[in-house]
Amino acid sequence: MVELNNCSNSEENGCVDSLEVRFTDFCKNGLSMGESFVTEATKLFNDSKHLLLSNNSTIGVITEGVERYWFVFVLYSVKRLSEKEVGNSSNGNEGNAFSLCQILRGAKLNVVDFFKELPQFILKVGPTLSNLYGSDWEKRLEAKELQTNFVHLSLLSKYYKRAYQELFLASGNNEDKPSATSSSAIHLPQYYRFGWLLFLSLRIHVFSRFKDLVTCTNGLVSVLAILIIHVPVRFRNFNINDSSRFVKKGDKVDLLASLGKIYQTSIDDLRETMDKVNYLITEKLKKKPCLASEFRTENLDNLDTDGLTYFEDLMEESCLPSSVSILEKDYSDAIQNKGELDERIFVNEEDSLLGSGSLSGGVVNMNGVKRKFDAMASPAKTVTSTLSPYRSPNCANSKMTVATPVSTAMTTARWLRTVIAPLQPKPSAELERFLSSCDRDVTADVIRRAQIILEAIFPSSGPAEHCAAGGSLQSTSLMDNIWAEQRTSEALKLYYRVLQTMCTAESQILNGNNLTSLLTNERFHRCMLACSAELVLATHKTVTMLFPAVLERTGITAFDLSKVIESFIRHEESLPRELRRHLNSLEERLLESMVWEKGSSMYNSLAVAKPSLAAEINRTGLLAEPMPSLDAIAMHINLSSGSLPPLPSLHKNNLAPNGQIGDIRSPKKVCSEYRSVLVERNSFTSPVKDRFLALNNIKSKFPPPALQSAFASPTRPNPGGGGETCAETAINVFFGKIVKLAAVRINGMIERLQLSQQIRETVYCLFQKILSQRTSLFFNRHIDQIILCSFYGVAKRTGADHVDIITFYNEMFIPSVKPLLVELAPAGNAEKNNHNDGQGPASPKPSPFPKLPDMSPKKVSAVHNVYVSPLRASKMDALISHSSKSYYACVGESTHAYQSPSKDLDVINNRLNGNRKLRGALNFDVDAGLVSDSIVANSLYLQNGNCRSPVAHVKTEQPES
């Protein structure tokens, strides 16, 4: 710990120099880095260390933990952003061949902590990185992509482990073969590890850029098929003749159809991926493929072998270690110079590098881990949401009945596969009728536009991009093209489908088929295409194209997209709940911050609707640039040869008035950018946030205005009459949405703080007046900042007690509590001493925070048929047994495809009220009609593995943070 407040100027310089000494020592001695790399890393460290030192202003100390985090962030940034071509280790890069995991081990930090704090480092050091590495540093750093990839791999590793344990035993079950039991300690880890390494090899050599969750799940299921075919039968944990679980083809089992049924994968996709896995085994492991139909072995008994490939000796005990070693070396060589995460840590159960945190639906939830950069934290919200535990009826009879984030994604992908994929990739006859009924036939324009825009969103690979396997494997370019073509087709069909429904609805509103002003509007069609593409990306949960990529590649702004989201949801009735939630989350994110950013087209409409604001809007340069033409986008696609970068300067402000990088320095950046990693690909939220429910309830009462006025020229009179211009109408609708969103958040704050109804109404009225009369306060800000300031201002004005938090903090709290805060700082040293001398960090210290029971202290009435409980998804599977599952409905889950949980409540009511055979006499006395707290608490504590009586500790359910 360095106490800078006790240093004089000369001493402070010594303290600063000691930081550099420790950093250099960490690089050279801790990680054995090369001299050139250390020089470059030291340059970034020296240019950014003033930001680290500035955080001591309140407490006056820098903990060793914060220092080590800064070391790691600097090294990771330099590794990713270095302009040097990193090739073979023989080219002078002997000291630079290290991965992110090696850096973390050297600093004795874990991955979860790293990702939790990384956004704060980027927020602070962004301008420095831009000066050193150019304006495209953020794209090259790929921090969001790396974090999303980590989330996906965490989910996939758990999915794989659960599936493996369901399919295979820890030891052989044939007692006639004693060697099975004696070697079980070798077989299970080796088979399990072999499968994961084979999957990682598939990701490296086949999946390339597009490592989306659905494609990777297909790869894992293909690996499971390889294991089923080759792992000795004595290790199986299933009966191949189990007709309720496996699909029969004649008198034998169709393996791929069975796996497709159990894991909700497309059989065609599974078959294609299986071919790639087989080719990978042939090329990398040098195994000779044989037609399974021509091979006789116990593993293939009762299997339909048509189309299956068998590799002799692939899983034999004598050959397996060699195969594992080959895959290990191949993976090590592939990631050696990339500075990426070593994805083998997910099957190293003894490896504590993953940390004590847990992943729930893409959100890093820390269990008792204190933020190291509290002093650096931004006012952005921490968003937590769990993935919808949707259960497919197709899996009701299988052992995979417990829904997971992965199975939820596969269920939503099934909607694309079964509802959208069968459609024609061209306008239907009904849609063509609308297109041809315009003042001129716009069918050809619509088709051409869709082709160009979707190619910009889903670019094909250039011919020069090939796999790093020396050409032995199928080129990565071809695989990328196949993926892009499939996603383009899905988005195109969805676009035509929703466009037709919208045209039908608009024609009914306008009492005519002539929709010229709408169907000839370029911005409207691009918004529809962007919305369709975003849903396809969200369904597959891609890593490389996170929102707002669709905005950048289509040339539209957040304000444009916000106009169509509600209509899109209304006009696609088959849209799964998970995708509806995704669009709701996007709309909220657009309204709360992105629409107010510099370069938003909202300012163009606002300048017309409110001329008094035009001067301020022009002075601050908030107006949007002209939307790039289709020809410009098409030319950009052709010039880029498939590797399409974002169109230059469409939405991102390059320099703020103070000369800093405005896009990074904005106080809302963490919320709008890094929140995307946790939200937009994690759109399968469950339960639905209260604000979404309330906002949707408000929306449902007011039908949306005709889309023609929403996308008309701002200065054009509104065709609906009323004397308004289209800009005034659009701004009024937009302001209405802002007010409704603010009302939901104000109400939530009031409930949490237990404030009066009068305060709620006063804050709400103040917010409305600020929006209408002081609109410029919202410019380039997050609406939560206005809401919080409104709360504080109202509290000051109404004379509430103890509200001057700023004065209290500066003048009373810190002078009194500073010694106590300083005492907390040595935790960094204690943490260091807690580590062993081994490679990874030691086990985390138990949290002093008490474990709160997941229950409400209220009595549970036996009179009511359905008890609505704030049951956490994390406790659902443990609490609900297979025998009682049919009597529960969990928010965000349904037992019927694409249906709401409310319908499940009706089903449960009917089941409870139906004719049932009572096995014994029931006591309906009043006293017996209530289930006591102790009974409920004991049941919960037993599930948690805690047998202590919790009666004295029953507390109200706390929301997950």
From Swiss-Prot:
Domain of life: Eukaryota
Region described as Spacer: 607-728
InterPro entries in the cross-refs: Cyclin-like_sf (IPR036915), RB_A (IPR002720), RB_B (IPR002719), RB_fam (IPR028309), RB_N (IPR024599)
SMART domains, per database record: DUF3452 (SM01367), RB_A (SM01368)
Predominant cellular place of this UniProt entry's protein: nucleus
Location of the region described as Domain B in the Swiss-Prot/TrEMBL record: 729-819
GO terms of biological process kind: cell differentiation; negative regulation of G1/S transition of mitotic cell cycle; regulation of transcription by RNA polymerase II
Subcellular location per the Swiss-Prot or TrEMBL entry: Nucleus
Keywords, in A-Z order: Cell cycle, Nucleus, Repressor, Transcription, Transcription regulation
Region (Domain A): 404-606
GO cellular component: chromatin; nucleus; transcription regulator complex
Region (Disordered): 829-856
Alphabetized GO MF terms: RNA polymerase II transcription regulatory region sequence-specific DNA binding
Region span, Pocket: 404-819
Pfam families: DUF3452, RB_A, RB_B
Biological role: Regulator of biological processes that recruits a histone deacetylase to control gene transcription. May play a role in the entry into mitosis, negatively regulating the cell proliferation. Formation of stable complexes with geminiviridae replication-associated proteins may create a cellular environment which favors viral DNA replication.
PANTHER family, A to Z: RE32990P-RELATED (PTHR13742:SF17), RETINOBLASTOMA-ASSOCIATED PROTEIN RB -RELATED (PTHR13742)
Family statement: Belongs to the retinoblastoma protein (RB) family.
Full protein name: Retinoblastoma-related protein 1
Organism annotation: Nicotiana tabacum
Native organism taxonomy: Eukaryota, Viridiplantae, Streptophyta, Embryophyta, Tracheophyta
Underlying gene: RB1
